[in-house]
UniProtKB/Swiss-Prot annotation:
Binding site residues for Mg(2+) 2: D58, D105
A GO cellular component annotation in the UniProt record: mitochondrion
Name of this chain's protein: Probable tRNA(His) guanylyltransferase
Protein encoded by which gene: Thg1l
Record-level Gene Ontology MF annotations: ATP binding; GTP binding; guanyl-nucleotide exchange factor activity; identical protein binding; magnesium ion binding; tRNA guanylyltransferase activity
The record's free-text note on cofactor binding: Binds 2 magnesium ions per subunit.
Main location: cytoplasm
Keywords for this protein: Cytoplasm, GTP-binding, Magnesium, Metal-binding, Mitochondrion, Nucleotide-binding, Nucleotidyltransferase, Transferase, tRNA processing
């Protein structure tokens, strides 16, 4: 009797599991349409593991954008501060960015070596950075350009570059900062010759043809009494964004006995914030001061 019952339960269970399996198969077949195969056309764009992932953005045709929006020449501090505000937003909204560097119409964002954000898909990194940056540029425009309406929507191109070692990453950032220095020195003399000496752009270009750094410094000093080293750091060095612990003091209402109700007290707390620096990245000093950026766990 007992054996008969056990056999019956067994065959019932077997029948149920066959039905269940059929249903599941049918369900899966139904969920997959005949068009499903097009998924296979998607390319794998996973960034190589253990590499620094750098996303660099650059303003599209900003030569024209700067003209149309009356940017000051050679440097418009409103435009540079707006770029930095957008980059700060990118760092705060997205994940795993350990440092960013910007100058002119470009910003580079460095994702930590071991980031597994969106399974390290390059297209996700690039498009999320570019779209967050571009929407922030429009969103915050009025805060920096109070009297200058935004005349058309700006665009930013993006690229992803992988750097396999700390040295190559440091060299990449040094390259961008050296570019900032070379362009800024040239532009400072170029516009001084036009704005202060009345040369035409073609004449200014001719005057600077073949000149070396020392020559440009000399022209600035002897003709315009400008010591290039005293020009603002933001123009000469660009902007570095890093995470830093900042002590914040806020006045806060505290719970006290009824007779003291509503009293406020200063409360200090430490938060990690994105901080903008206009410092040198090429020498060792910066990396010694901020060892956590290249630390192994990154
Ligand atoms: N007047 C002024 N112009 C700026 C400033 N920052 C950037 N620009 C302009 O933006 C340009 C940026 O250079 P590029 O990125 O090489 O060139 P682009 O015109 O943006 O062209 P693509 O990047 O190739 O699309 C500079 O050459 C300037 O004309 C600024 O502070 N003041
Ligand atoms: Mg550009
Ligand atoms: Mg550029």
């Amino acid at each position: 009797m007992w054996a008969f019952r056990t056999a019956r339960i067994g065959s019932l269970l077997a029948a149920t599991s066959v039905i269940l399996r059929r249903c599941l198969r049918l369900g899966v077949a139904m969920a997959k349409s005949k068009f499903e195969y097009v998924r296979n056309f998607e390319v794998q764009d996973t960034c190589l593991p253990h590499c620094w992932v750098v996303v660099r953005l650059d303003g599209r045709n900003f030569h024209r954008f700067a003209e149309e929006h009356n940017f000051a020449k050679p440097n418009d501090s409103r435009a540079l501060h707006l770029m930095t505000k957008c980059a700060q937003t990118v760092m705060e909204e997205l994940e795993d960015i350990v440092i960013a560097y910007g100058q002119s119409d470009e910003y580079s964002f460095v994702f930590r070596k071991k980031s597994n954000w969106f399974k390290r898909r390059a297209s996700k990194f690039m498009t999320l950075v570019a779209s967050q940056f571009a929407s922030s540029y429009v969103f915050y425009w009025r805060d920096y350009f109070e009297d200058q309406p935004l005349r058309y929507p700006p665009g930013f191109d993006g690229r992803v570059v992988l750097y396999p070692s700390n040295q190559t990453l440091k060299d990449y950032l040094s390259w961008r900062q050296a570019d900032c220095h070379i362009n800024n020195l040239y532009n400072t003399v170029f516009w001084a010759l036009i704005q202060q000496s009345g040369l035409t752009p073609v004449q200014a270009q001719q005057r600077l043809k073949g000149t070396l750094t020392a020559d440009k410094n000399e022209i600035l000093f002897s003709e315009f009494h400008i010591n290039y080293n005293n020009e603002p750091h933001m123009y000469r060095k660009g902007t570095v964004l890093v995470w830093q612990k900042v002590e914040e003091v806020r006045t806060q209402e505290v719970r006290l006995p009824a007779e003291m109700e509503g009293e406020k007290k200063a409360v200090a707390r430490t938060r990690t914030r994105v901080v903008a620096l206009n410092c040198d990245l090429i020498g060792d000093a910066f990396w010694k001061e901020h060892p956590e950026i290249l630390a192994e766990e990154n």
